[in-house]
Amino acid sequence: IVGLPNVGKSTLFNCLSSAKAQAANFPFCTIEPNLGVITVPDERLNKLAEIVHPGRIVPATCEIVDIAGLVKGASKGEGLGNKFLVDPLEDKSVIDTELQLKDLETIESQLTKQKKTAAAGNKDAKTMVTVLEAYKAVLEQGKNARGVTFETKEEQKVAHDLFLLTTKPVLYVANVDEASAKTGNEYSKKVEEIAKEEGAECMVIAAKTEEDIASLETDEDKLMFLEELGLEESGVNRLIKKAYALLNLETFITAGEMEVKAWTYHKGWKAPQCAG
């Protein structure tokens, strides 16, 4: 989870995981990232359990990281001014810029060394230089690296292993008030438009309301709360499913007397790969 301070990141993180991160209305309330484990909702597990009657149900899980709130200048270790006006597009621009600068720093730290090695005839270094320079050219234009594609498997592997921040797939989450939880508002519409232009996913969620829902003890109470808002499913569940799909992850299920268990695999894997 990446975003500016005061936008509901830690509240959202708390809803997604069992951990309780500090949700403070000031910058850098967290310096180190918060780590949590979330369960992937899957209605099939309970249905299978009704048939098999296992000793336990084990859902699929994945890790989630709440990065300390980014601010303009964060890539240089700078702090935050006093600007708290709501402008999601400006927020996005700040985040993009900071991540791009960090990626450029990563690239430039390697490029000089790799050029020297490539000049000596090293084939792998030449591939690395090709990839680094392609990314550098795009980032210097103020664009994210995820738009860069490579033709050869060697280049693709090098690109993957760089783990640049702006190559990662994006799901934009627009945090709104309770009244806008179903349809969004003028601000979330702006985010949806820019996400569509980028071919990215976008969704609306009311993080504070989700926190209230998560605090309810029974599923019946949660369902009643959602019905009052005109929602069929919690925003948290929708978010987890969207993120799971965005990462090209799917699950298969094994069922027996001991347990009904969901296993995570990458979309496109064949059975031997899934079996490990």
Model region roles, listed by residue range:
Residues 1-92, 96, 107-108, 113-117:
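Conserved G1/Walker A P-loop phosphate-binding module
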Residues 1-2, 7, 13, 113-276:
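C-terminal-of-GTPase-core extension/linker across diverse P-loop GTPases
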Residues 21-29, 43-50, 55-56, 68-69, ...:
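Flexible, active-site-adjacent loop/turn segments at secondary-structure boundaries
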Residues 41, 88, 100-103, 125-128, ...:
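Generic alpha-helical segment signature
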Residues 86-109, 181, 189-202:
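Switch/coupling subdomain of P-loop NTPase systems
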